[in-house]
Design a protein with these regions (language model features):
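Active-site loop-to-helix "anion-binding N-cap" substructures in soluble metabolic enzymes
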Residues: 1-413
Length: 413
């Protein structure tokens, strides 16, 4: 079901609680990758142009309240959202073509925050301090939800990377506002995610063959998404360390490769579907690589020697996977094929990334995370039909057949 979006909302003169994802990589106050800020601009610009009073919210990093007070203070200092303001203001003014007043509120609740919101004029923005400064945010605390919702007349969710979490800012606030008859909608970024990933959930007959490429370390992390994809896909290409659990389940010697012994029966069972494709050769080494000078050697999948571990798919596998990808009409990729940050073990990831990027007749999607970073680094990201902004969220959306808490709570069109 299509969700109401920012275009559907009448927000002139109204306070809009906007949940963005400004969880950007940074060193001190220097932002090292502004992609998430840039991605949020179309939604914020739309609200500015509509004359909304905008309360912007986001998290930045993690805060573990089980730590000592000193450690918590250090985490809060690292997660101070004020570093976002200069880049946000610059990007927004470039988009709307005029000056926009953007202020920062260091408070996350209480009189200071309430006054900052009351002081907004139409088309102005206040960015609230990191939502995770509040212990109750990640617990969907009803009292915090009540306070934040009381500040707003409407709600917009544009934080896809957090939509698989039932937090106050992604779930509690819109739930309360909806119960009061106030409007809710998704932003342009979330709308694009719903539409693009939706094609991987509801893959029509004309969009087959449908090929999924799954990498990463653990089968256990991907059980639910594998089960969902088995119902939809024609082939699932397995790479990364999770491949060695499958290979061991089939009776291959895997040396010291990472394996989940408690998943062997499950791996064997789903291999029987006939849709799982495994590496026929691997790049191995005696130890996990510590730096970029590490080297490896190629061996067949049934010949990994004792004392050696698999760290990438081999050249025959890469060629085979590339051929399967080239014949696909829909491709979903999540997870590198090996230790892709080390050159000797990056070729498998490069091969699948290149094959998907060059399949111009296919609808190609990267499910965020390490795969998105790899595609960007290799210069292929722009050739994909869609690069998701949320790794965990994209996987959960696929395994839950298009449902996520932060999206489901938004009203339908």
């Amino acid at each position: 079901m299509a969700k109401k979006d920012v275009r559907d909302l009448e927000v002139s003169g109204k306070v809009v609680f906007v949940r963005c994802d400004f969880n950007v990589p940074h060193k001190g106050a220097t932002i090292t990758d502004n992609n998430r800020i840039v991605a949020a601009i179309p939604t914020i610009a739309e609200l500015v142009n509509k004359g909304a009073k905008i309360l912007l919210t986001s998290h930045l990093g993690k805060i573990d309240f089980k730590k000592t007070p000193e450690e918590i203070d250090a985490m809060k200092k690292k997660g101070d959202l004020s570093i976002i303001v200069p880049e946000l203001k610059a990007q927004l003014e470039k988009a709307v073509g005029h000056e926009v007043k953007v202020t920062f509120c260091p408070a996350t609740r209480g009189e200071e925050l309430a006054n900052a919101v009351k002081g907004l004029n139409n088309g102005e923005i206040v960015l609230m301090q990191n939502t995770r400064y509040e212990k109750g945010e990640t617990k969907n605390d009803p009292e915090l939800a009540k306070e934040w919702a009381s500040l707003a007349d409407a709600y917009v969710n544009d934080a896809f990377g957090s939509d698989h979490r039932k937090h106050v800012s992604t779930y509690g606030v819109p739930e309360l506002l909806r119960s009061e008859g106030k409007p809710t909608g998704v932003g342009f970024l979330v709308e694009k995610e719903i539409v693009s990933l939706g094609r991987c959930v509801e893959c029509s007959e004309k969009d087959h063959p449908y090929v999924a490429i799954l990498g990463g370390a653990k089968v256990s992390d991907k059980i639910l998404v594998i089960e969902s994809l088995l119902k939809k896909c024609d082939k699932i290409l397995i790479g990364g360390a999770m491949a060695y659990t499958f290979l061991k389940a089939l009776g291959h010697h895997i040396g010291t490769s990472l394996v989940e012994d408690d998943q062997l029966d499950y791996a064997k069972k789903i291999y029987g579907s006939g849709k799982i494709v495994l590496p026929v050769d691997n790049v191995v080494a005696a130890a996990y690589p510590e730096d970029e000078s590490a080297t490896g050697e190629v061996v067949n999948s049934d010949e990994i020697p004792e004392g050696m571990m698999g760290l990438d798919i081999g050249p025959k596998t890469a060629e085979n996977y590339a051929k399967i990808i080239a014949s696909a009409k829909t491709v979903f990729w999540n997870g590198p094929m090996g230790v892709s940050e080390i050159p000797a073990f990056a070729n498998g990831t490069i091969a699948v990334c290149k094959a998907a990027a060059e399949n111009e007749g296919a609808f190609t999607v990267i499910g965020g995370g390490d795969s998105a970073a790899a595609a960007k680094k290799l210069g292929f990201a722009s050739k994909f039909s869609h690069v998701s902004t949320g790794g965990g969220a994209s996987l959960e959306l696929i395994q839950n057949d298009g449902h996520l808490p932060g999206i489901d709570i938004i009203e339908d069109k």
